[in-house]
C-alpha cells in the first residue's frame, strides 16, 4: 500500500457493522463486518412500520461513521369504537405495539378479553382481540335462614342492586343486616352482600362495672338490644359510653371503665428537687391542673428553657420535664498547666470537672495553686491557667488596628475606622489577665446631610451616624413626596430614599397643569396649534355654560 493510501485510510477510515435499527432491516443479507467510505446500504421498514420518506438507506461517511437516512413510522390500528356499559382505556395511542384496556361499568361483567394489542396481522396491523361485551350481573336465589324468611320468594331472578329483606319468627331476634343486596365481586360474578342475618334467642347476664353502679334500666332478665345506664363512683371518671347494650353474643358492649379522676405517683425528675409547699406525699392524688415545682440541685441547670414544673393533665398524666443537666467547669489547658491533684466531689457524672471538684496545679515557677469548681460552672478563684498574654484583639467591621505577633499584659491597641465611618466606643483597649478590656469599639457608617428644598430637618448636622433617624417637615404650601422619616443605613445612604417637598397645587389649577404637560408632549408645532384651538374652544364652551346657568338662576328669582 502506498503512503498516500495508508494516510487516506488512517484519516477517513472505514465503517464497522451498521447499527441495529428497531424500525428497519437491511434490504439484502450482509456478511461484511466493515465497509468502505461512501458505501450506501438499502433498508426496508420492519413489519408494523411504514415509510415516511423516499430515502431508506445508511451511508458510510468518510470519517468512518454511519449516517442514517431512514424514516419509518409505526402503522396505526383502527379506532376500536365504544364499549356499551363500559369504557375503552387507551394507554398511549392506536399505533403498532400500543395497548388498550376494556372495563365494564359498575354492576356489569366483562365477557371477553380485558386487553388488546395493536399487532401485525398479514401485511398490516390490527387489534389482537375484538371488542368484548358487558352484561349485567345476576345473583342466585337469596339464602334461606332458620327461624326467619325473606320477601323475595316470588321473584324468578335477581339482577345487580336487587335487594331482599329478612324477618324473624316471633320470640327470635334478628342479628345482622336485615337487608342484603345483589353485588359484583371482582367484576366477574354476582353475589349477595352482606351475609344474611340470623335469628337467635339472646339473654345477657347481670351487668357489672368496676367502681360503677347502675343508674337506670333495672330488669330481672336482659335480652338482646336491652340497655343499661351506669355512673361512676365518687373520685372516678367514666371512660367510654355510660350506656351499654346487650349484644348478639350475650355480652354487654361497649364496656365502660371507671378510672381514678386524678394524677398519682409524683414524678422523679433527674437531678432536681421538689419545692412545692406543702410537700406532697407519694400516696396523694392530684386533681387535673395541679402544678408541682422543681429546682435543679447544685451543679446542675435546666436541660431546656421550659419552666421547671409538671402539670397534671386532662389525660391524668404528668406533663414531661427533661430535668437538669450537669454544668461542667472548663478543662485547664494541659500545655501550660500541670495538674498535681484532682479531688472529685461527685464521681457519678459525665464532667471532667464538676461542682465541688478541687484541683491543685503548678506553672513554670513551681508555685502550688488551687482552684475549686463552683455550682455555676466557673472556677474559684479563677480558671487554672498559666497564660499571661492575650489572644489577638477582636476584629471590627470597617475598622483596623496595628497588629503584633504577641500581646502581653498591659499591651494596648488602638482602633481607627475606614473613611466614611465614625468610631463609637473606646478607641484603645488593654490586655489584662488574658482578656481585652474594655469591649472593642464599633465603626458606624456616616451619612451626608440630606438636601431638602422647601423643608426642614428635625436634626440639622453636617453628618449623621448609622441608625440615626431624621424627620422631614415641609414648608407651608408644600406637600411631601415620600417618607417623612428616614434612617442612616450601614452603607452610608438614607433609607428610604430622601423625600421631596413640592408645591401644593389647588384643585382649580389641575386642568391648567394638565394642559401644560400636554403641550410639552406634542411632537410638532401644527399639533400644538391644533391642541390650543381645541383647548380654547373647550374654555369658550365652559364660559357659555356658566352664562346659561347664571341666566337660569336669574329667571328663577324673578
Swiss-Prot record:
Keywords: Complement pathway, Disulfide bond, Glycoprotein, Immunity, Innate immunity, Repeat, Secreted, Signal, Sushi. Pfam families: C4bp_oligo, Sushi. The keyword Disulfide bond applies. Glycans are attached at residues 31, 177, 186, 469, 491. CDD domains: CCP. It comes from the Eukaryota. GO terms for biological process: binding of sperm to zona pellucida; complement activation, classical pathway; immune response; innate immune response; negative regulation of complement activation, classical pathway; positive regulation of protein catabolic process; regulation of opsonization; response to symbiotic bacterium. One of its GO terms (cellular component) is outer acrosomal membrane. Its main location: secreted. InterPro entries: C4bp_oligo, Compl-Cell_Adhes-Reg, Sushi/SCR/CCP_sf, Sushi_SCR_CCP_dom. Residues 1-13 form the signal peptide. Disulfide bonds join 15-60, 45-72, 77-118, 104-134, 139-182, 168-199, 204-246, 232-258, 263-312, 296-324, 329-373, 363-386, 390-431, 417-443, 447-488, 474-501. It is found in: Secreted. Residues 14-74, 75-136, 137-201, 202-260, 261-326, 327-388, 389-445, 446-503 form the Sushi domain. Controls the classical pathway of complement activation. It binds as a cofactor to C3b/C4b inactivator (C3bINA), which then hydrolyzes the complement fragment C4b. It also accelerates the degradation of the C4bC2a complex (C3 convertase) by dissociating the complement fragment C2a. Alpha chain binds C4b. It also interacts with anticoagulant protein S and with serum amyloid P component. Disulfide-linked complex of alpha and beta chains. This is C4b-binding protein alpha chain. It comes from Rattus norvegicus (Rat).
